[in-house]
Amino acid sequence: MALWGGRFSQKADQRFKQFNDSLRFDYRLAEQDITGSVAWSKALITVGVLTVEEQQRLELALNELLNEVQANPQAILQSDAEDIHSWVEGQLISKVGGLGKKLHTGRSRNDQVATDLKLWCKEYISHLHQAIVELQQVLVITAEKNQDTVMPGYTHLQRAQPITFAHWCLAYVEMLVRDENRLQDTLKRLNTSPLGCGALAGTAYDIDREQLASWLGFASATRNSLDSVSDRDHVLELLSNASISMIHLSRFAEDLIFFNSGEAGFIELSDRVTSGSSLMPQKKNPDALELIRGKCGRVQGALTGMMMTLKGLPLAYNKDMQEDKEGLFDALDIWLDCLHMAALVLDGIQVRRSRCAEAAKQGYANATELADYLVAKGVPFREAHHIVGEIVMMALTQGKALEALPLTELQKFSSAIIEDVYDILSLQSCLDKRLAKGGVSPKQVMKAIVEAKQRLKLS
C-alpha cells in the first residue's frame, strides 16, 4: 500500500508506478531504515505519541524484521512497494497491526531517506577504509621485498632516472593515504542526523533531535531543516573521493599493464588474474588491470551525473534526488571491488629483477648524475646540462652507454671530468645520492617502509 493517496481520485498508471518506484535499488537501505525507525519510535515516547509498551512492541517487531532482512535482503524485491520506507511500514503493520500506522507520526520520507542514506554511507565508509588499508599493506610488503630491484623511472613514458620497484610501490601508498584522509574528512561532515526535520520545515513534535542523533550514532543533529532534507553534499563528496581514488587505481593499473607487456617485461601477472584469447592460444591478457582502468570512467560519470542533477534544484526536496542512490551505490561498489582486485593482482605478481636492472641501464638514465658531477666541479648547471646533452648525442652515435665512453672522449667536452667520473655513473650511485626525504636512496626507502609498516600495524 502506498503511503499517500487520500487526496487522489484516480489510481496511478502502472507505467508511472514502475517509473516512480525506487524499491529495486533503495532496498539496500532496509537495515538503515529499520534502525532509524527504532530510534524514531523511542522519540515518540517522549512526546506522548507512543506508550512504553507500544514502543516495545514496535521495536520487537522491527528487530524481527531486521533479522529477516539480514538473512535474505533480496526477498524485499518480491514486493511491489513503492520504496523501502513503504515496504518497512507495510511489513511492520503485518506484524503488529494498526499500531504500526502510528510510527510515521511527525516524520517525512524526506528526512527519513536523508537519514537512511547517511547511515548507509557511514557503514560503507568503514568497508572502504579497510580495503584501502589492505591495499596499502600489500604495497608495503611488495616494496619491502623489492628494495634492491632497480628499474627505470619514467617521464613522458621515456626512461628518465633509475628508481627501485619499492619506490614505485610507495608512491601508490602515498596516493592511498590521501584517499583515506579524504574519506575520513567526508565522514566528519556527513556525521550529522537529519531525522526530525520533517518534509522541510521541521517536525511539529517537540522531539530532542540531539538525543535522537546520539541514538543513531551521529555526532550531532543538523541545524537547518530546509537544508537537511535537500543536502546531498555527502553524496557528491563520496563520489569525488571515489573518482580521485579510481584515478589512482587506473594509473596503478596502467603502470602494471605496461610493466607486464612484452615491450617492458618487468613483471609477470599471476594466472589467477589474467585470461586468454579465444583465437590466439599464446595470449595472457591483463584483464583485471584493464577492467580497473576501464571502470574509472564509470565512477567519474556518476559524479558528473549527480552534479548535473543537483545544480538547478530549488529548495527543498525534489524527486530528482531519488537519482542520488543508483550512481552512488554503483560507484562505491566499483571502488571497493577495484581496491580488492588491485590487492589481489599485486599479491601474485612476479618481479623480473634482472630485466628491470637491464632496462635501467638503458636510455642514459644516469645523464643527470653526470650533470650534477660537473656542477660539483664548479660548472654552472645550465652549462653542465648542455655539455651532458652533447655527450649523450655522441654516445648515441657510437651506440655506447655513458660509462662505456673512454675518459679521453669525455674530456673533449669538459676538462673538469677526471677519473672519478665513473664512480658516479653506476646505477647504485644514482640511487645512493637521492638522500633527501622522499628520495629513492635505499636509506630513505627503508625509512619510508618502516614508517608505513608502523602506521599500518604490519609486523
From Swiss-Prot:
Main location: cytoplasm
Reaction(s) this enzyme catalyzes, per UniProt: 2-(N(omega)-L-arginino)succinate = fumarate + L-arginine
Keyword Ligase: no
Location of the protein in the cell: Cytoplasm
Assigned protein family: Belongs to the lyase 1 family. Argininosuccinate lyase subfamily.
NCBIfam families assigned: argH, PRK12308.1
Name by which UniProt lists this protein: Argininosuccinate lyase
Organism the protein comes from: Photorhabdus laumondii subsp. laumondii (strain DSM 15139 / CIP 105565 / TT01)
